[in-house]
A protein has these predicted regions:
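Cysteine-centric segments in proteins
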Residues: 1-66
């Protein structure tokens, strides 16, 4: 089971925000929700990457919880 919180970082300015995470598929993808906007994050082999409104975001994904 995974936490419902993740940290997204904007690659242009390195600003990080806490977002709601859902539909986690380890090593594949998860959905990040920020200000009611959904950003689909895809695994690139190192981090999850997603694009919205002309900006790129990265994340290590939500934490695994027991």
């Amino acid at each position: 089971m995974y936490d419902n919180i993740a940290i997204l970082t904007n690659t242009m300015n390195n600003n990080s925000v806490e977002v709601e995470a859902d539909n986690m598929r380890p090593g594949k993808s998860f959905d990040a929700y920020i200000a009611s906007n959904k950003i689909r994050m895809f695994w690139n082999g190192k981090v999850y990457v997603g694009n919205a409104h002309g900006m790129e975001f990265t994340s290590s994904g939500p934490k695994l919880i027991n």
